[in-house]
Every structure is written in C-alpha cells, then in structure tokens.
C-alpha cells in the first residue's frame, strides 16, 4: 500500500466533525469535481443515488461551506472543494489502489532501455509521469557528493567525441562534444591524462573551477589538439546556475489541456511562472527527500503554489541501500486524479531508484 504524507500542518476540519450524511455528500462533491472540473450542484448529488431531497442536500452543502470545506465560485449555484477540503479528502477519504500490470511494464521497459544514461533515465521518468498522469512530470537530480574518479575522452565518428566523467559513487556524466579536425587517439589520451591528474577526488563544481584555472597550463604543456580538447571539455561541462542540481520538467503542454476558461488560462500562466522558480521547486522537492512515501502539497499549503492553485504529488527515489538520491513527482491543477497519480508516482520512484543502482 502506498504510504502518504501530508504536505500541510495547519489545522483543518476533521472527518470527526462530519456526521454520516455530511461525509457522504462531501465525498460525492469532491469525487464529481475531480472527475469533471465543474462546480457540483444538489441535483447532481441527488441523481447519484442519495436518498435526500435537493433542499436537504443544499443545506448540508451550506454547512460544509461554513466549515471551510466547500466554496461557491462566482455566481455558480454549485460548489467546489476548497484546498482545505481537498486536503481532508486526500488524507481521510481517498481510496488509493495500484497501477496495472501494463503500466508497470511500460515504466520498467522505458527506464531500463538499453544504453540509457542516468541523465536520460531521469528525463524519461519525468516524461513517463507526464504522459500517464496528465500533468507536468518533474525530477530533481541527486545531490552530487562523490568526487571525480576518472575522466576520459572517446572518439565518436569523424567529427564528434564523448567527454565521460565517472564519480566515486559510481554515477557517470556524459557530454557530447564537437571533435576538431586533427584530433588523434593520442590527443584524446593526452587530454584525458592531463585532466585525471588534476581532477581526481574533486567534486563536479571543484572540477569545473579547476579546469578553468588550468587552461593556460594546458596550452603550455599539451600539443595544440589536446589543449583544445581540454578547452572544449570545459565548455561542455559548464553552464547552469547550480550544475550539481538539475531540475527536469516534461509535459508543460498537458497543463493547457483543459484550460478553457479565461481564469483557467491565467492559473496555468501562473503555474508556468512557478515552474521557472528552479530554486524554490528544488527546495520543495528536497522536503520530499525526508519523507518515507508519497507526499502531497495542495494549493495554498505552499507559498510557491499559492497563486496558481496547483498541486504537487511527489516521492523520493532511493538506492538499494535506502539512501535517498532525489525526488520525482507530478505538478498539475488541484483537481488532479489523486487516486491514479499517487501510485504512479510511487512506482516510478521505486523503479528509478533501482535503475540508478544499475
């Protein structure tokens, strides 16, 4: 069974505050809203088999609104759950099942595709969740703790080379480079030896700083082609404000799929702005690293999503030694299909962790 952790600590109404009738109507309102995205009226509830008059249902829905669990958008006669209502539903009424065997095979086959690097696997995991869950898939890469163990340049055809950096923790980073004319196997080996002598044991950030500082030395001590390889290697490994922590987002277009009303488009625009806040998103996903299961953040529970009214469902992925490596999840509107997305995120995180173990 998927283990869930609330992303919200503020006090909200409890299920014990509701009698059986109120609990049943509340559940039906939330389930209908999550399915359709439309405000739910008393007639919709009565057609669902509730043995109460529309007037009695309206009175109960009004009571739920006074508790802060339902709200009436604009002039609509229907109700939608508030963020507090969604939290109570997710924590107390949501029935989370499991994913199907076909989806399990899809996730495993795509992540364990032959020759896929760790970087490619994390991007693929994000894309998988985006496709299966209908939101934007998001992955934060592991914190790089190990030092550089080995650097190597490998020829790939006549005009390309691969810069390979192996770390003490066993992970491998690859960068594709343009191979200049005249680069020989001897030049590739000379450049590799030069960098190995200077970078071994350093973190990736330290290695990049050292490579930049050693360019003049390379130009003096190496032949022209080997020196150029070192320079090109520096260019290939540079870039990004926080190179040790990458944030991978796939499926932004999914967020536009059901945004028909103008206010929905404004919400999505704000969510797109949220997705550009790399530091804040990484910080939020780092909070997930301390959880032992799927964690759910709903709307205004987090400062980041307070304007866009979005939800994040995320889980840590970890090595076989139970070391937390990073976090993966799905971002979307608060009416995400929680019952479906939660087990998808949980299983994808587990498979990604196995893949990272090799």
Curated annotation (Swiss-Prot):
InterPro entries xrefs: GAF-like_dom_sf, HrcA, HrcA_C, WH-like_DNA-bd_sf, WH_DNA-bd_sf, WHTH_transcript_rep_HrcA_IDD
Keywords: Repressor, Stress response, Transcription, Transcription regulation
Pfam families referenced in this protein's UniProt entry, alphabetically: HrcA
Recorded superkingdom: Bacteria
Disulfide cross-links: none
One Gene Ontology biological process: negative regulation of DNA-templated transcription
GO molecular function: DNA binding
NCBIfam families found in the cross-reference section: hrcA
Reported function: Negative regulator of class I heat shock genes (grpE-dnaK-dnaJ and groELS operons). Prevents heat-shock induction of these operons.
HAMAP family for the chain: HrcA
Family classification: Belongs to the HrcA family.
Name the record gives this protein: Heat-inducible transcription repressor HrcA
Native organism: Caulobacter sp. (strain K31)
């Amino acid at each position: 069974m998927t283990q869930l952790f609330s992303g919200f600590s503020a006090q909200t109404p409890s299920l014990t505050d509701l009698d059986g009738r109120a609990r049943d109507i509340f559940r039906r309102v939330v389930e209908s809203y999550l399915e359709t995205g439309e405000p739910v009226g008393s007639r919709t509830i009565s057609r669902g088999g509730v043995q109460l008059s529309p007037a009695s249902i309206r009175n109960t829905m009004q009571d739920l609104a006074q508790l802060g669990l339902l709200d009436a958008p604009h002039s609509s006669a229907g109700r939608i759950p508030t963020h507090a209502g969604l939290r109570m539903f997710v924590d107390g009424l949501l029935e989370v099942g499991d994913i199907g065997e076909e989806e399990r095979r899809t996730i495993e086959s795509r992540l364990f595709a032959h020759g896929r690097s760790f970087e490619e696997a994390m991007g693929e995991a994000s894309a998988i969740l985006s496709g299966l869950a209908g939101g934007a898939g998001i992955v934060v890469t592991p914190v790089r703790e190990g030092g550089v163990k080995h650097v190597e340049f490998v020829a790939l055809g006549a005009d390309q080379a691969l810069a390979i950096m192996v770390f003490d923790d066993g992970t491998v980073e690859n960068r594709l480079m343009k191979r200049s004319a005249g680069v020989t196997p001897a030049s590739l080996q000379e450049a590799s030896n030069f960098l190995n002598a200077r970078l071994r044991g350093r973190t990736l950030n330290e290695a990049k700083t050292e490579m930049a500082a050693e360019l003049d030395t390379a130009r003096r001590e190496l032949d022209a082609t080997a020196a150029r390889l070192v320079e090109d290697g520096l260019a290939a490994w540079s870039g990004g404000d926080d190179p040790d922590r990458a944030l991978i987002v796939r499926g932004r277009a999914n967020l536009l799929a059901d945004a028909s009303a103008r206010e929905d488009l404004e919400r999505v625009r704000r969510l797109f702005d949220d997705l550009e806040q790399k530091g804040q998103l990484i910080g939020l996903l780092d909070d997930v690293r301390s959880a032992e299961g799927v964690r759910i953040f709903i709307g205004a529970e987090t400062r980041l999503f307070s304007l866009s009214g979005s939800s994040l469902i995320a889980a840590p992925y970890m090595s076989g030694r139970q070391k937390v490596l990073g976090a993966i999840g799905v971002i979307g509107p608060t009416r995400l299909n929680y019952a479906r997305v939660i087990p998808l995120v949980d299983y994808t995180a587990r498979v990604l962790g196995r893949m990272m173990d090799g």
